[in-house]
Amino acid sequence: MFRGANAINLDAKGRLAMPSRYRDELDSRSAGQMIVTIDAVDPCLCLYPLSEWELIEAKLRDLATFREENRRLQRLLIGNAVDLELDGSGRFLVPPRLREYARLDKRVMLVGQLNKFQLWDEDAWNALADADLAAIQKPGAMPDELRDLIL
């Protein structure tokens, strides 16, 4: 499982170095093969080990294609999906089109989301994290099922 938020640098060629603490798990789960695609809700990218992406792809394939919203989601996620592989130095190349979508420049946040990562522009991530914290702290803002999760 992938956890934590990691500030990493995007180099001039559009490569990111995967933090070493995740590399063994990525190697064992998918031989370092990953898929990156857009997040259909937030202005970030989703980075999946290939084995996880194949599960999502199967669910997308099973959606009823006569519904426009299903086709739209399939086009967005599958149409923007790109195969990636860690190189010998643990780096991977983020395609220019996807970097533009997420507005990734020099400083990037790699955020573990259990079965995947999100890639955020650092400033966008910090603003969202602050807004999320403020929203969840408002009285009555948290649904009962989430209140039960808090330790």
From Swiss-Prot:
SpoVT-AbrB domain ranges (all copies): 5-52, 81-124
Keyword Zinc (UniProt): no
Keyword presence, Endoplasmic reticulum: no
MF (Gene Ontology): DNA-binding transcription factor activity; transcription cis-regulatory region binding
Record's GO cellular component terms: cytoplasm; nucleoid
Pfam families tied to this protein: MraZ
InterPro entries cross-referenced by the UniProt entry: MraZ, MraZ_C, MraZ_dom, MraZ_N, MraZ_sf, SpoVT-AbrB_dom, SpoVT-AbrB_sf
Compartments it resides in: Cytoplasm, Nucleoid
SUPFAM superfamilies assigned: AbrB/MazE/MraZ-like
Positions of transmembrane segments: none
A Gene Ontology biological process term: negative regulation of DNA-templated transcription initiation
UniProt entry keywords in alphabetical sequence: Cytoplasm, DNA-binding, Repeat, Transcription, Transcription regulation
Subunit and partners: Forms oligomers.
Family from the record: Belongs to the MraZ family.
Protein name: Transcriptional regulator MraZ
Organism in which the protein naturally occurs: Pseudomonas syringae pv. tomato (strain ATCC BAA-871 / DC3000)
